[in-house]
Amino acid sequence: GRGVFARRKLKSGMVLGEIQGQIFPVEPDDPSYCMELPSGRVLEPAAPLRFLNHSCDPNCELFYWFDEDGSLQEDRLWLQTIRSINAGDELLIDYCWPADAAIPCRCGTPDCRGWIVDPEELHLLPRQEAPGALPRQTTPDSPAAGG
């Protein structure tokens, strides 16, 4: 698959840029890369940021910009780092999909939820590991290890 990678070391809290692309009033026929905006419209990002991959332990996040008067710029979405990132590391976001759109996650992080889903909606999904998810790491004292 594709991804987006840092060309140089990035500091935590850096605004990397605006997610630009085509805005649709409704979800297009192929919504694979689309992001819902607060206005209810849908943004289909342009390359390269359309290739941001998911992780349950992301190093970047998406945010909405507010004008000086505090009003939300509803159709403007930005990307920023949430921790330091080394040159060559992949930029990763948490997709936070609603439970009704969740799919199995294979990010492989120690805190993988097993599903690509908004953490606040994880309780709506089956408690067992998602089919095909990488096994969670266990320690000798963890319940999964029998300790």
Where do the protein language model's features map onto the residues?
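Catalytic cores of histone-lysine modification enzymes
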Residues: 1-69
